[in-house]
Each structure stands twice: as C-alpha cells, then as structure tokens.
C-alpha cells in the first residue's frame, strides 16, 4: 500500500492510496471515506441496489464485533468474508468495534479486549484476534487495542495503562502476523490511544510509528464537537508526529462540520456510519456542499435551506416522535414530520440518486408512517450518495484551493 500526496493545504492532505487489494490494483482518493456495513452488508441494501449509488468507496468497512460470533461458520467456508458476503472483488478494512454501537467500559484486561456482538461479550486475546483475521482475510485491519479511554473522564493511571496495553497488543500481533504466511498481504493499522493527555497521545503516536504498520487509527475521538478546540488540538499534535506517507483513519466522526475540522488537522479516511444513523432516524441529508455553485441553481439551493426546510423549525410536528430525534443535526430533514405529507418534491432538488429521481418526500413520509422496509432502502440510497458526493466536493475544493470556503459554507448551515 502506497500513499502519494499531491497537495497539502491548511493541514488537509490531497492524494491517492494505491497498490492495495489482493492484486495490488486498487486505488482510493483521500480525503475519503469507507463503505460502512453491518456484517459485511450495506445496511438496508442488496448488492444490486448498491450498484445504483454513485461514488461508492473502493474500500468496504467491516467490524470484528459483528462478525466474531460467526467465526465457526466462516472457518468451515474457508474462502474469507469477501466471497461469503457475495463481494469477492471488494477490498475490506476490518475495525475492532462498530462505530455506531457504544461499548460498555471496564471489561478490558492486560490479556484481552472485550468485543460486544448481538450475543453479548466476546473476550478477544491477540491469539484469537489473529485467528479471526485469518478467517476473515481482510486487506487492512485495525490492530487490537485498549480503546476504552476517550478524551475526558479518565484518570492518568488508566490512560497510561491503555497506551501500554495497546503497544503490547501491537507487538504481539506483529509477531503472530509474521508466523502466518496467508496474512502477509494484509496491512495492519496501528491504533493511537491516550485519551485527553497530550504526553500519552504523543507517546502512543511515536511508539506506534516505530512499528511496521501500514497506517494509523486515531482512536477515541468520536463524539467530539467541531467547536471543541482543546480536543481538536490533540488531533493536530498527534498527526504532526505521524509519517507523511501513511494514511490516518478515524472512527465515529461523521457530521460534515466535524469531518472538515479533522481533515484540516491531517486526517485522511473516515467511516460512513453517519448516513446510516441519519437513515435510522427517518431523515434525509439536504446540506449543500458545492463550494462553487452554478448561478442558475444558487437561488434554488438557497430556497432548500430556507427556514421552513430546516430541522429547527419551531412549528414542525413529528407524527411519531422517538428518542432518535434528539440526535438530529442541522444537515438533515426529518421526513416523519407532518409537513411532508403533501410535499411531492424530491428529497433534495438536483440530487441524481434513485430515490430523488423516482420518488417524493410525501411518498417516503408515507412509507415511514406505514413502517415499510422500503423507507430505509430509499433513504439509505439517498444518504449514502449525498455523503459520498460530499467527499468528492472536499477533494475538488482542495484541488481548487477552496477548502476554507467549503468549511465556511458548511459552518453557515450549522448556525
């Protein structure tokens, strides 16, 4: 795997990752995102419906926590997760945890990390971890690490222990990797831990960079708001310690404003769980991300973001409110609201996704109220395509030297 940077602007890195995949013929532009999946399948979508989406990332994101309990089945199959999931030509990145599902804390030890699947807790030693990777056969995988510590709320002693454990796990995994010929083509991604302690973050980054890893995961930064400068400064400090020629990953950061903050601090790759979370709320992404809008559509886009279209509309009534609505962002509209019952326009004017070309807000509202499975399918198609096009706009803005203009455009939609 090789990362070639073509431009660095305001900390943001534009480039291409090449020479990866089983045949070494795949490429991935950065900044970019991965295709989020549940047990190696895009949520709500079949392989055929996935093909209708434009700009699908070259790398599919699978999670060990959702697949570990199926290890025996995959061992008997003996062909790896790619063929098992019907995606034989896909490139897979395997993370330890699902970024959507919070993990209970207090269960990691010096010998094992606890994963949480549908059947409960699974203790994962380094031996079991490498055994699972041999069965899954991903192209990239995150190293086992003690990632319970996040910025805020942990003692210095616990944070130091997290870094120490993670480095021990990394060394053990590297040793085990060298003993298994079938894992030689796989790329190990080292995890940078350290909570909110700058010295521990830097120690973790420096020590991990000394090992033969193919990239770095900045772990434990999910849930940090875009305006939290103290925490964001940790990201800048960590990326400054990492080699320029290896990609930097992050999990659980998906809001457009947060993505741009992290990109401008040197992060390259994100997961795409955010559009899935938006879909689960019965919402559709409608934010504008064109930093150089066509004058003919500028008035239309302005209308899209008018007061009556925003989530914060005081008069908006949701027919069946639920707890998820508290998580809504200014970048989406909730199609459960009564005002969409007779709105026969597309989810987003100008969007070329299958849903917007063929169906209306009123129809999706009806599907949500009737609890039809098609609602999730149509929303997932739209939200994935809009999110993937957002990253395309980020790369275009970097090429044009307009990344700050794009960040300002996104910031205005968050105000």
UniProtKB/Swiss-Prot annotation:
<dbReference type="InterPro" id="IPR028592">
    <property type="entry name" value="QTRTD1"/>
</dbReference>
<comment type="subunit">
    <text>Heterodimer of a catalytic subunit qtrt1 and an accessory subunit qtrt2.</text>
</comment>
<dbReference type="GO" id="GO:0046982">
    <property type="term" value="F:protein heterodimerization activity"/>
</dbReference>
<keyword id="KW-1000">Mitochondrion outer membrane</keyword>
<dbReference type="GO" id="GO:0042803">
    <property type="term" value="F:protein homodimerization activity"/>
</dbReference>
<feature type="binding site">
    <location>
        <position position="351"/>
    </location>
    <ligand>
        <name>Zn(2+)</name>
    </ligand>
</feature>
<dbReference type="GO" id="GO:0005741">
    <property type="term" value="C:mitochondrial outer membrane"/>
</dbReference>
<keyword id="KW-0862">Zinc</keyword>
<dbReference type="InterPro" id="IPR036511">
    <property type="entry name" value="TGT-like_sf"/>
</dbReference>
<dbReference type="Pfam" id="PF01702">
    <property type="entry name" value="TGT"/>
</dbReference>
<keyword id="KW-0479">Metal-binding</keyword>
<dbReference type="GO" id="GO:0005737">
    <property type="term" value="C:cytoplasm"/>
</dbReference>
<keyword id="KW-0963">Cytoplasm</keyword>
<dbReference type="GO" id="GO:0000049">
    <property type="term" value="F:tRNA binding"/>
</dbReference>
<feature type="binding site">
    <location>
        <position position="356"/>
    </location>
    <ligand>
        <name>Zn(2+)</name>
    </ligand>
</feature>
<dbReference type="InterPro" id="IPR050852">
    <property type="entry name" value="Queuine_tRNA-ribosyltrfase"/>
</dbReference>
<comment type="function">
    <text>Non-catalytic subunit of the queuine tRNA-ribosyltransferase (TGT) that catalyzes the base-exchange of a guanine (G) residue with queuine (Q) at position 34 (anticodon wobble position) in tRNAs with GU(N) anticodons (tRNA-Asp, -Asn, -His and -Tyr), resulting in the hypermodified nucleoside queuosine (7-(((4,5-cis-dihydroxy-2-cyclopenten-1-yl)amino)methyl)-7-deazaguanosine).</text>
</comment>
<dbReference type="GO" id="GO:0046872">
    <property type="term" value="F:metal ion binding"/>
</dbReference>
<dbReference type="GO" id="GO:0005739">
    <property type="term" value="C:mitochondrion"/>
</dbReference>
<feature type="binding site">
    <location>
        <position position="353"/>
    </location>
    <ligand>
        <name>Zn(2+)</name>
    </ligand>
</feature>
<keyword id="KW-0819">tRNA processing</keyword>
<dbReference type="GO" id="GO:0008479">
    <property type="term" value="F:tRNA-guanosine(34) queuine transglycosylase activity"/>
</dbReference>
<dbReference type="InterPro" id="IPR002616">
    <property type="entry name" value="tRNA_ribo_trans-like"/>
</dbReference>
<dbReference type="GO" id="GO:0101030">
    <property type="term" value="P:tRNA-guanine transglycosylation"/>
</dbReference>
<keyword id="KW-0496">Mitochondrion</keyword>
<keyword id="KW-0472">Membrane</keyword>
<comment type="similarity">
    <text>Belongs to the queuine tRNA-ribosyltransferase family. QTRT2 subfamily.</text>
</comment>
<feature type="binding site">
    <location>
        <position position="382"/>
    </location>
    <ligand>
        <name>Zn(2+)</name>
    </ligand>
</feature>
<protein>
    <recommendedName>
        <fullName>Queuine tRNA-ribosyltransferase accessory subunit 2</fullName>
    </recommendedName>
</protein>
């Amino acid at each position: 795997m090789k990362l070639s940077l073509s431009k660095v602007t305001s900390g943001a890195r534009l480039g291409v990752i090449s020479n990866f995949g089983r045949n070494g013929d795949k490429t991935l532009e950065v900044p970019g995102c991965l295709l989020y999946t549940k047990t190696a399948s895009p949520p709500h979508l079949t392989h055929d419906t996935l093909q209708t989406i434009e700009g699908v990332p070259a790398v599919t994101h699978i999670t060990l926590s959702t697949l570990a309990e199926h290890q025996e089945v995959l061992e008997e199959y003996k062909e790896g997760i790619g063929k098992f999931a019907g995606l034989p030509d896909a490139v897979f990145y395997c993370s330890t945890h699902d970024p959507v599902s919070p993990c209970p804390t207090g269960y990691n030890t010096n010998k094992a990390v606890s994963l949480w699947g549908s059947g409960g807790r699974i203790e994962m030693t380094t031996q079991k971890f490498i055994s699972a990777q041999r069965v899954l056969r991903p192209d990239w995988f995150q190293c086992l690490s003690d990632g319970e510590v996040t910025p805020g709320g942990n003692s210095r002693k616990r944070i130091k222990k997290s870094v120490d454990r993670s480095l021990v796990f990394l060394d053990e995994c590297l040793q085990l990797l060298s003993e298994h010929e079938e894992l030689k083509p796989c790329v190990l991604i080292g995890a940078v831990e350290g909570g909110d302690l700058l010295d521990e973050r830097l120690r973790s980054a420096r020590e991990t960079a000394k090992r033969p890893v193919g990239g770095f995961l900045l772990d434990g930064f999910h849930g940090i708001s875009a305006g939290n400068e103290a925490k964001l400064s940790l990201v800048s400090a960590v990326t400054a310690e990492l080699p320029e020629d290896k990609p930097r990953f992050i999990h659980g950061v998906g809001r457009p404003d947060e993505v741009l903050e992290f990109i401008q601090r040197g992060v390259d790759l994100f997961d795409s769980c955010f559009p899935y979370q938006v879909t689960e709320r019965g919402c559709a992404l409608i934010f504008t991300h064109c930093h150089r809008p066509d004058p003919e559509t500028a008035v239309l886009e302005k209308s899209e973001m008018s007061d009556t279209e925003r989530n914060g509309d005081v008069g908006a009534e949701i027919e069946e409110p639920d707890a998820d609505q508290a998580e809504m962002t200014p970048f989406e509209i909730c199609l459960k609201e009564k005002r969409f019952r007779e709105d026969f326009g597309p989810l987003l004017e100008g969007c070329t996704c299958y849903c917007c070309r063929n169906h209306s807000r009123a129809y999706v509202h009806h599907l949500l109220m009737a609890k039809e499975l098609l609602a999730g399918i149509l929303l997932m198609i739209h939200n994935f395509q809009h999110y993937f096009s957002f990253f395309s706009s980020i790369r275009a803005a970097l090429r044009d030297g307009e990344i700050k203009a794009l960040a300002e455009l996104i910031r205005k939609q968050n105000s």
